[in-house]
Amino acid sequence: MSRIADTFAELQSKGRKALIPYVTAGFPFVDITPALMHGMVEAGADVIELGVPFSDPMADGPVIQKAGEKALALGVGLAQVLEMVRSFRLRNSTTPVVLMGYANPVERYEQRHGKGAFARDAGEAGVDGVLIVDYPPEECEQFAADLRGHGIDLIFLLAPTSTAERMQQVARVASGYVYYVSLKGVTGSGALDTAAVEAMLPRIREHVKIPVGVGFGIRDAATAQAIGRVADAVVIGSRIIQLIEDQPHEKVVGITVDFLRGVRKALDA
């Protein structure tokens, strides 16, 4: 079993839900990411999603776009993100790390380092899962096999508009968990309709037999608690970015820890 599968199995045995915070790698300071990841774990995170900065992030709302632009300006690319994961792994060998991003940086990395280099290097760095927003499941079988060969799960997004056929395609190649995008549109947008999420999850579970995480639009502990009643995991990203984007270096980790502790407490209530 993968580290992600182990984590979900352990949580399910205790009747708990996974807390999955997201942050753009290298934001808001290029050297802060490993410390921020350790803070997230201390606050109760079960899995960490690290955003790989990209210049044209079509699924990201303005908050995460801006974070990505800042990280890119600081010189953060895929190679630097893998180095951050390596650094995190020096002190943590148990918390799963998922890279979330777009096809272009992966393809550029492979052009530079050779075919299969991404899966190899991500596995060596200690990455557990990869979510590539613009890789369709029907074209991913080889990529999924490459990742599996290095112990890495391939994670997919599902949306309110996803058809049964799409869910079946995802179910064939996905592992670890699937990420249900609870709003139409981009990350961090609009208010979350928890009743609509609750209605959708049984449809997803008809086809997908791995855990389902829900994200996009979860901004506070109360919403996380409501989603945690029906989903296997709660993903929070834009809100964390907003909380830390204008903070001085010495406050970033503490602010994140305080916020996530409140969410963890609500999820466990």
From Swiss-Prot:
Belongs to the TrpA family. Gene3D superfamilies: Aldolase class I. Keywords: Amino-acid biosynthesis, Aromatic amino acid biosynthesis, Lyase, Tryptophan biosynthesis. The gene is trpA. SUPFAM superfamilies: Ribulose-phoshate binding barrel. Transmembrane segments: none annotated. Tetramer of two alpha and two beta chains. The alpha subunit is responsible for the aldol cleavage of indoleglycerol phosphate to indole and glyceraldehyde 3-phosphate. GO terms for molecular function: tryptophan synthase activity. The active site is at E49 (proton acceptor), D60 (proton acceptor). Pathway: Amino-acid biosynthesis; L-tryptophan biosynthesis; L-tryptophan from chorismate: step 5/5. It catalyses: (1S,2R)-1-C-(indol-3-yl)glycerol 3-phosphate + L-serine = D-glyceraldehyde 3-phosphate + L-tryptophan + H2O. It is an enzyme of class 4 (lyase). InterPro entries: Aldolase_TIM, RibuloseP-bd_barrel, Trp_synthase_alpha_AS, Trp_synthase_suA. Its EC number is 4.2.1.20. This is Tryptophan synthase alpha chain. GO terms for cellular component: cytosol. It comes from the Bacteria. PROSITE patterns: TRP_SYNTHASE_ALPHA (PS00167). It comes from Acidovorax ebreus (strain TPSY) (Diaphorobacter sp. (strain TPSY)). Pfam families: Trp_syntA.
